[in-house]
């Protein structure tokens, strides 16, 4: 069965925005929103064709950030604040890719949640 392709409305956005980067051990997700929190563009490593263990590499993080940033740049976004969350590989590569795509990074904040000795962590891997 053929899928119906929907045409997205191209809405111009304000030049200020917020980039949320979630870098887990298994994947990287980048969401770009306006200041109010409405999503302008998003991307993930899986959406960009990476599968399995390749999703948590710095290169996958770079490609994911470039894809989301290019779409936001085309809609008129220029300056962004970056909120980064999670322990995954490629956190720095994602920020550098945002700058390479033409977005000016105004501030970077690490909002990784840290427990005050809450849940017991999973046991250590023995490889």
From Swiss-Prot:
PANTHER family documented for this protein: 40S RIBOSOMAL PROTEIN S14/30S RIBOSOMAL PROTEIN S11 (PTHR11759)
A biological-process GO annotation: translation
Subunit record text: Part of the 30S ribosomal subunit. Interacts with proteins S7 and S18. Binds to IF-3.
Domain of life: Bacteria
NCBIfam families per UniProt: PRK05309.1, uS11_bact
HAMAP family: Ribosomal_uS11
Keyword tags: Ribonucleoprotein, Ribosomal protein, RNA-binding, rRNA-binding
Official protein name in the record: Small ribosomal subunit protein uS11
Single GO term (MF): rRNA binding
Coiled coil regions, renumbered to chain: none
Originating organism: Chlorobium limicola (strain DSM 245 / NBRC 103803 / 6330)
Gene Ontology CC terms: ribonucleoprotein complex; ribosome
Biological function: Located on the platform of the 30S subunit, it bridges several disparate RNA helices of the 16S rRNA. Forms part of the Shine-Dalgarno cleft in the 70S ribosome.
Family to which this protein belongs: Belongs to the universal ribosomal protein uS11 family.
Pfam families (alphabetical): Ribosomal_S11
